[in-house]
């Protein structure tokens, strides 16, 4: 019996390792946990909006049957870690990972401040800007929007597995065998601490550990006629770019959104928070030299910053105090924002 179960599990893992990287909903294996998520999306958001590639790429490649086959108590073996496209602690990626890569998620929390080894952190030029800078023909500094975390192609766990893992730092480190004081162990500590911190005034937040959890939160905050947007390609980072055509989503009216930012964790975790009183823009990003389009960017402008922490990186970069100025930033490659479907 045990031999038969082990053989079946090995076959499932081989299948998972051979699954194609998803690009379109139709290409997601119908027996995978990712396909289950696509069907869940269609039930919860019935507006026939396309499923963007950047979201599909995060879905679990595991066959749906694997999650029900895992033993109890749950254990994550190296083979499961690889086949589920998780960030395994013994991978080459983690040996070269910078100790500060996971700070960017905090950057977009209202309450974020330099509290965790941030003393010598340099804020990326162009990461924050004024709303008036987002104008066709302007030449601005584009920050490095290529999120280092996305290079590892990590995935969400199936919800049935993620829900079985206590969202506690010691439990996660034990489950994944993380050594103390390693980059990943420190990131787990920081992520859990940020997720468990109290929300700022006017903010509703949730750290989501599955794609279904993210969908639920976005629908709860905005309703079911929504779409998710992100910067399309990581072109133009760290250099001056020209702003092309700019479109205000929903006519540029003040609205609300749910923004989600990736945290460094053994499996995919996003810090999602409701963002009231914002304007969302889509902008063409052009080469200064050729004037040719090299990217499509999504930017959010926060109209009311009165509830933000006075030590927030935006005020360090732009000056001013909470409530004095509007603050805009690009949605980084790897982050995303959910908004009400555009009617304009």
Curated annotation (Swiss-Prot):
- Give the gene name: BURP16
Organism for this UniProt entry = Oryza sativa subsp. japonica
Instruction: Provide the free-text tissue specificity comment from this protein's UniProt record.
Output: Expressed in roots, stems, leaves and panicles.
Per the record's keyword annotation, is Signal included, yes or no? yes
> Known PANTHER family for this protein?
POLYGALACTURONASE 1 BETA-LIKE PROTEIN 2 (PTHR31458:SF2)
Q: Which UniProt keywords are given for this protein, alphabetically ordered? A: Glycoprotein, Signal
Protein name (record): BURP domain-containing protein 16
Question: For this UniProt entry, which residues form the secretion signal?
Answer: 1-25
BURP domain: residues covered: 128-341
Its lineage opens with: Eukaryota, Viridiplantae, Streptophyta, Embryophyta, Tracheophyta
């Amino acid at each position: 019996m045990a031999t038969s179960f082990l053989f079946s599990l090995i076959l499932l893992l081989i299948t998972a390792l051979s699954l194609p990287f998803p690009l379109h909903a139709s290409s997601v294996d119908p027996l995978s946990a990712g396909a289950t998520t696509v069907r869940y999306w269609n039930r919860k958001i019935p507006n026939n909006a396309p499923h963007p590639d950047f979201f599909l790429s995060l879905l679990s490649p595991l066959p749906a049957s694997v999650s029900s086959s895992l033993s109890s108590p749950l254990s994550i073996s190296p083979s499961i870690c690889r086949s589920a496209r998780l960030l395994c602690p013994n991978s080459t990626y983690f040996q070269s990972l910078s100790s500060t890569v996971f700070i960017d998620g905090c950057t977009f929390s209202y309450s974020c401040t330099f509290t965790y080894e941030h003393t010598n952190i340099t804020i990326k030029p162009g990461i924050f800007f004024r709303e008036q800078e987002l104008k066709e023909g302007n030449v601005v500094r584009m920050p490095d929007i290529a999120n280092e975390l996305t290079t590892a192609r990590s995935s969400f766990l199936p919800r049935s597995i993620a829900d079985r893992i206590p969202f506690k730092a010691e439990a996660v480190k034990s489950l994944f065998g993380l050594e103390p004081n390693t980059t990943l162990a420190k990131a787990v500590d920081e992520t859990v601490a940020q997720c468990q911190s109290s929300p700022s005034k006017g903010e509703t937040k949730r750290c989501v550990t599955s794609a279904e959890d993210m969908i639920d939160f976005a629908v709860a905050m905005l309703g079911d006629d929504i779409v998710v947007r992100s910067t399309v390609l990581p072109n133009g980072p760290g250099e001056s770019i020209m702003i092309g055509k700019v479109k205000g989503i929903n006519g540029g009216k003040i609205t609300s959104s749910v923004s989600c930012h990736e945290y460094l964790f053994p499996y995919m975790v996003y810090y999602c928070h409701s963002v009231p009183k914002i304007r969302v823009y889509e902008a063409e990003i052009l080469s200064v030299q050729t004037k040719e389009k090299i990217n499509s960017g999504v930017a959010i402008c926060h109209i009311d910053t009165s509830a933000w922490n006075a030590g927030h990186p935006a005020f360090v970069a732009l000056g001013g105090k909470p409530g004095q100025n509007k603050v805009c930033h690009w949605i980084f490659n790897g982050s995303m924002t959910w908004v009400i479907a555009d009617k304009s």
